[in-house]
Amino acid sequence: MTRIVWMIGGAQGLGVDTSANIFGNAVAKAGYYLFGNREYYSNIKGRHSYFEVVISEKPIRSLSSYVNILASFDAETVFQHFTETKEYLIYNVEYENTTVDLVKSMEPEMAEQVKEALSKERLGFTIKDVLEYLKRRGVKVIGFNYTELIKKIADTFKVPMSVVERAKNMIAVGASYGLLGLKFDYLKDAISSTFKNELFIKFNTMAAELGYNSVPNVYKLQEYKIEKQRIQVDGNTISAMGKLAGGLRFQSYYPITPASDESVYIEANQNLDMIVEGNELRKGGVVVVQAEDELAAINMAVGAALTGVRSATATSGPGFSLMSEGISWAGMNEVPVVITYYMRGAPATGLPTRSGQADLKFALNVGHGEFPRIVIASGDHVEIFWDAIWALNLAEKYQTPVIHIIEKTLANAYSVFEEELITNRPYVIERGKIVKPTSDYFNRFEVTEDGISPRVFLGQASIFYTGDEHNEEGHITENSINRMKMYEKRNKKLETADKEIPEEQRVNIVGDADIVLLTWGSPKGAILDAMEELSKDGIKTMMVQVKMFNPYPKNLMKKILSGKSKIIAVENNYNAQGAEVLAEKTGIFATNYILKWTGRPITREEVIEGIKKILERDEKRVVLYGGA
């Protein structure tokens, strides 16, 4: 199976993302599957960012620790990624004499790592020395004088060089595409569909062609016919699509990385054709509100839910912290609201543009007091879509806050897959116990056998909501007997959910072996790809991915894990929080750990290396460091 890893890097604000999307689009048009990931600093312009794209004729689920083709147009990209580069480097010859110390945007720690790698080879600290380092390892270097080529393009179209400056990206993209050996027409089409200005299309196409014609066809990739409609989508977008398919009618948010793009997409696509009762088709839409802060965002979402619309908000760590009191209020008042929690590097501001899984226990215990919080976590883009619908259904059925965890890795990564994976079954909407009032007064918190009360909406009858303890009507009371009754009623809903939601729906099990890879969230893809490689070496493994953490599938987990010789927790945090929850709920402990908390994704190769260290050296805890 083909697996080619391509990377492009450069200063933020200079078109790295656009270049990567054009390249990926062109490769996908030739019938290939992709998995791409964007890494960037918490800086608007100037700092180093890069985009990695993995290419294969079969579906791809993970990133790699190496790069086959590194496309660069600045010095920092070469310095940051030369040790990962295995086959080809495309670089700017004008920077050959640039030293590490002259790259002022590079962090001192990274500069020291570069010097250490070059010093081991008794080399200096210039780009020219990096080229020698790569040549010693069989990497071929392809240099371009970008200024000369940009001048040629500017002269051709009789425009100033400043107008076509960013077209140098397309020179690197064109050269990369040429190495693959795919038809230039696909790249030309991708450029045309990206830019609207005719002049921009022309000079970017010329730049790409200059690069394309300057390199040999090395990989000789063949074109594949696309049999079924495919979709190329990132995590923010697929979550928004799932919410729209699930009947979302109100979304509030305050801008925060990496959550904001979801709300922006919903707002851009808020006018919808809706099928309502009786199969009647009518125009409708979603109200999207950018609030003044996260406190307002959660309170707006709660208020909208009380009026009877499907309501959600989206945020990340610091914003989720601010929402804590509002979530507790929603728990007390049994409000069906969804909080999409985009997890990033923490604590505090932490790593605002990097990933992490350190907030699982926070999500499980957010808000003061004991009340039901349903918590689910998605492992890939298809799961995100269906889980977004599921979250809305769970919130209304059990009348409680639902927290849907998506990590930054999945939010900013994109994948290519068959569209039928998100259209192959009906979008079922379950609204729970909604009734029409029969009088002016309604006991909103009526005690029932399953803990779930009939629900009407604001304006349909006299209903009372308060943050204080209350009786069935909603009136404030501190009576001890009532307190016991209402407290049990609220918490009984989680017991009901535990009985009604099949445990098989809460856990994803792949394979059957004595070695278990226990995980949740984004490591899923790296694990599945690693399992395929490990099986070639005769190492049989199985994956157990927890999708719902509350209510926890304790009975099924006990059944699956009982008697296994190795339970290896693979997570993006320090404490293996998913494994800690397993121990808390079942008394079963992980035997080994593969952990990473650098803010970068776990790769396929890191999982393979970690498992081999555990099996061959009996290492208890393998810590991963990869990623620039």
From Swiss-Prot:
Coiled-coil region: none
Catalytic activity: a 2-oxocarboxylate + 2 oxidized [2Fe-2S]-[ferredoxin] + CoA = an acyl-CoA + 2 reduced [2Fe-2S]-[ferredoxin] + CO2 + H(+)
Keywords: Oxidoreductase, Pyruvate
EC number, UniProt record: 1.2.7.11
Motif YPITP motif, chain ranges: 254-258
Keyword Transmembrane: no
Binding positions for substrate per the UniProt entry: T257, R344
A GO molecular-function descriptor: pyruvate synthase activity
Pfam families: PFOR_II, POR, POR_N
Alphabetical list of InterPro entries matching this protein: 2-oxoacid/accept_OxRdtase_asu, 2-oxoacid_Fdx_oxidoreductase, PFOR_II, Pyruvate:ferred/Flavod_OxRd, Pyrv/ketoisovalerate_OxRed_cat, Pyrv_Fd/Flavodoxin_OxRdtase_N, Pyrv_flavodox_OxRed_cen, THDP-binding
GO annotation, biological process: response to oxidative stress
UniProt function note: Catalyzes the coenzyme A-dependent oxidative decarboxylation of different 2-oxoacids such as 2-oxoglutarate, pyruvate and 2-oxobutyrate to form their CoA derivatives.
Domain free text: The Tyr-Pro-Ile-Thr-Pro (YPITP) motif is important for the turnover of the reaction, presumably through its flexibility and mobility.
PANTHER family listed in its UniProt record: PYRUVATE FLAVODOXIN_FERREDOXIN OXIDOREDUCTASE DOMAIN PROTEIN (PTHR32154:SF16), PYRUVATE-FLAVODOXIN OXIDOREDUCTASE-RELATED (PTHR32154)
Subunit structure: Heterodimer composed of an alpha and a beta subunit.
Name assigned to this protein: 2-oxoacid:ferredoxin oxidoreductase 2, subunit alpha
The gene coding this protein: ST2435
